[in-house]
Amino acid sequence: MEYVAIDFQTANRWHKSACSVALVTVKDGKIIDTFYSLIRPGILHFDKENTALHGITKEMVKDAPYFDELWPLIKEKINGKTLVAHYARFDMDVLEEELTGNKLAFPSCPVFCTCVLSQAMFPEMPQHRLQDVTEKIGFNLEQRYNAMAQARACVAIVEYALKATGAEFLQDVADAYHFHLGYIGKDVVTECNFIILIEGVRLVMRILMLLLLCKSPRLITIWIT
């Protein structure tokens, strides 16, 4: 079983401002490849709040490759593999914005969110930030906002869950904790989310429909059956 942990850092509040990326490829529980690069954003503007977190400045990326220059290598490493990220919605938004903005072809990848996994594994925890989860499982996250450190932390969380459940595949872990994997592909990006939440929305919709039809019992009977 092979997957790739991925993490982006951004230069500013806009998702299309990736300034670093890290990939950690894992096969059968062992790291077989790592990749890290700074990225020069299309608009070379860094919010001071972002720099305060990850320490990357515009001077550091002025000679770095643009995202579209890196993409062929990144795509080769991730295409067809499950992507793992903490709060994957952010990283997939960054990836989607960069691909769309640069008119690049999307990969085809299932998406596994370790934040959703943590919420399922440790419901008693008040927060599920990466540093909280790694502390819970006994993994030392040395640099909280370094892309490579965060990607390695995601690997640690996944391997912890695989061992805890006795699962062989990430889909088995998702099934054990009752959530769906997300997906990124051509013209579609779906989030990793709890099955119970999805079913809950459907139940609420059915109840609302019943309330709307409550003045006509005959319609309710027809609709239910």
Residue ranges and their predicted role:
Residues 10-12, 116, 153:
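Short, glycine/acidic-enriched loop or turn micro-motifs at the edges of active sites
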Residues 105-118:
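Conserved beta-strand -> loop -> alpha-helix junction used to position metal-binding or nucleic-acid-contacting
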Residues 6, 112, 149:
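Active-site flanking residues adjacent to catalytic metal/cofactor-binding acidic residues
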Residues 116-119, 135, 156-159:
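Generic alpha-helical structural context detector
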Residues 114, 133, 172-175:
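Residue-level recognition of specific faces of alpha-helices
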Residues 1-108, 123-145:
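Conserved non-catalytic scaffold segment of RNase H-like nuclease domains
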Residues 158-224:
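Acidic two-metal-ion nuclease catalytic site recognized across multiple nuclease folds
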Residues 146-160:
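Acidic, divalent-metal-coordinating active-site segment for phosphoryl/phosphodiester hydrolysis
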